[in-house]
């Protein structure tokens, strides 16, 4: 087996797999447009226990609706006092796109493209809603902040920001919705405090919902910065029995989720960002999905009813996580939440590779491009013994080519004898015909794991490298890196010994070079950089190995 031919065949299979994965991700699901549109504030209703789904309703010119602005080091939030929920959320440390100074808008309520998270309560005794129709005898659920402030800011000398929204219900039942935000933390702790000062017991249920618009067309998100490597933009959940499970949004229309669990979380996923709800107390919850209004889906949780006697208080707690897919942060919030970083079936390799990349970035130069170069060098040096074994085995097989051709000519009419004599020759010369292929096959999972790791890392989003490369997660705007990669592949082919004499096969090899280069035109710069460095190392290792083989009489390039 010729070295360059085996290399290109396996690379071709890998690239084909990657492209199939991209196509499947783009066409199997409805990608969701979460473009930063001008939003209209739309509070959502709290449903009665008789309803099976939490359907949002719209209110315009609501006299009870006031907006409170929350500013921390990582968040800019806008909370509607009429629902007590977050209407808009911005991530201060992430921009909409590379050329924008505007913070990334993660939650919004535009009619066409909803992307929302809300947490509410309902009771058996009182039905709260944002519906102002008094004929239905429904109580208003509007809050007032205890300090009458319109803006809360986390000061530089503070590590946490806490504020309360209160609602005075009928019969002296006081409802407090408490928000707690910590510095450098994408977790928002939301606690309902129900003070039953009435003369009768009440029963309270906590529920939360994540809502997202879906469309019939495949819509590409601007938040992906036109990167062609889409990952699973779907819902996900974790329960007592399933550590991590993805849930196809389009399946919600036909099959609703309904799972009881005492632990877990629900989430909506983007390529680099996530919103998740984690019920803390009560422990017993049901995770469910709902198809809304022919174009919105909801994944949510609802607790069992809890009993609050007269004169008693109770607290219902949950966590809303909104932010980037940062492994170290998410695994501290909830078990298995870090699994939303989709490393595919090679996660057990990708995860330690990311830890190594993170270590290199932390303790060397503060440049993710340099870190990619260093991790590539380290991996290729570790795999050098396999590379040398591969080239040595191929060299031995090349030295046997004259004898193999002679056997083929002698037994061309007797396939059985031909195979027998070939095997005998391999045994006599102590050559494994698969010796050149097996080391390469062992290396391929590592290369694929690196691909998954680099394509999933939010750390590379808008990360500068050098010169014209301003975003390692986006394609090279001038296609210089893909062209350089194509040149390195050309040198690998030309410097590799070959016995191919068929001009058609030579043309096919050259065409494959062009095809691979075209494939990589739209790949993220970080991935292309990795392949360039890997190819350069391959060229260097080739020359070192061939020089050593020449001394042993095993290399004679034609």
UniProtKB/Swiss-Prot annotation:
Main location: membrane
Superkingdom assignment: Bacteria
GO biological process annotation, one example: protein insertion into membrane
Membrane topology of the entry: Multi-pass membrane protein
One cellular component term from this protein's GO annotations in UniProt: plasma membrane
Keywords associated with the record: Cell inner membrane, Cell membrane, Chaperone, Membrane, Protein transport, Transmembrane, Transmembrane helix, Transport
Complex formation: Interacts with the Sec translocase complex via SecD. Specifically interacts with transmembrane segments of nascent integral membrane proteins during membrane integration.
Record's function text: Required for the insertion and/or proper folding and/or complex formation of integral membrane proteins into the membrane. Involved in integration of membrane proteins that insert both dependently and independently of the Sec translocase complex, as well as at least some lipoproteins. Aids folding of multispanning membrane proteins.
Family under the similarity heading: Belongs to the OXA1/ALB3/YidC family. Type 1 subfamily.
Protein name: Membrane protein insertase YidC
Species whose genome carries this gene: Blochmanniella floridana
């Amino acid at each position: 087996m010729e070295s360059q031919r085996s290399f290109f065949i396996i690379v071709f299979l890998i690239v084909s797999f990657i492209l199939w994965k991209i196509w499947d991700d783009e066409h199997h699901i409805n990608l969701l447009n979460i473009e930063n549109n001008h939003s209209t504030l739309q509070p959502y209703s709290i449903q009665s226990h008789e309803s099976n789904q939490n359907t949002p309703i719209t209110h315009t010119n609501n006299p009870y609706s006031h907006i409170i602005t929350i500013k921390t080091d990582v968040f800019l939030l806008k909370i509607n006092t009429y629902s007590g929920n977050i209407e808009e959320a911005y991530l201060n440390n992430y921009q909409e796109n590379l050329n924008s100074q505007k913070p990334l808008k993660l939650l919004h309520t535009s009619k066409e493209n909803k992307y929302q998270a809300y947490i509410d309560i309902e009771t058996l005794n009182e039905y709260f809603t944002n519906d102002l129709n008094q004929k239905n005898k429904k109580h208003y659920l509007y809050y007032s902040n205890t300090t009458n402030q319109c803006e809360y800011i986390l000061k530089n000398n503070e590590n946490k920001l806490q504020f309360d929204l209160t609602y005075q219900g009928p019969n002296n039942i006081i409802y407090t919705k408490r928000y707690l935000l910590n510095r450098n933390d994408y977790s928002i702790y939301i606690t309902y405090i129900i003070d039953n000062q009435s003369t009768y017991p009440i029963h309270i249920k906590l529920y939360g919902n994540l809502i997202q618009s879906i469309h019939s067309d495949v819509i590409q998100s601007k938040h992906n910065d036109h990167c062609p490597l889409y990952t699973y933009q779907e819902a996900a959940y974790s329960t007592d029995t399933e550590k991590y499970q993805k849930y196809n949004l389009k399946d919600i229309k036909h099959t609703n989720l309904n799972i009881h669990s005492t632990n877990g979380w629900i989430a909506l996923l983007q390529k680099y960002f996530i919103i998740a709800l984690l019920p803390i107390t009560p422990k017993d919850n049901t995770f469910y999905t709902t198809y809304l209004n022919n174009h919105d889906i909801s994944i949510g949780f609802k607790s069992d009813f809890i009993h609050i006697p007269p004169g008693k208080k109770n607290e219902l707690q949950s966590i809303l996580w909104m932010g980037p897919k940062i492994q170290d942060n998410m695994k501290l919030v909830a078990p298995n939440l870090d699994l939303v970083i989709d490393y595919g079936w090679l996660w057990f390799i990708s995860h330690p590779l990311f830890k190594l990349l993170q270590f290199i970035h932390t303790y060397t130069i503060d440049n993710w491009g340099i870190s990619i170069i260093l991790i590539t060098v380290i991996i290729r040096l570790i795999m050098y013994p396999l590379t040398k074994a591969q080239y040595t085995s191929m060299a031995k097989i090349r030295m046997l080519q004259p004898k193999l051709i002679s056997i083929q000519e002698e037994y061309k009419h007797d396939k059985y004898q031909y195979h027998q004599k070939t095997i005998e020759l391999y045994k006599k010369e102590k050559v494994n015909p698969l010796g050149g292929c097996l080391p390469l096959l062992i290396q391929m999972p590592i290369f694929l794991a690196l691909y998954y790791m680099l394509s999933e890392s939010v750390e590379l989003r808008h990360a500068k490298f050098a010169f014209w490369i301003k975003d390692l997660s986006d394609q090279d705007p001038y296609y210089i890196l893909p062209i350089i990669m194509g040149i390195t592949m050309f040198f690998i082919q030309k410097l590799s010994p070959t016995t191919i004499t068929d001009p058609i096969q030579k043309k096919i090899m050259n065409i494959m070079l062009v095809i691979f280069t075209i494939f990589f035109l739209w790949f993220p710069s970080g991935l292309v950089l990795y392949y360039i460095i890997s190819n350069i190392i391959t060229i260097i290792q080739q020359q070192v190995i061939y020089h050593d083989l020449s001394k042993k009489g095993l290399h004679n390039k034609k």
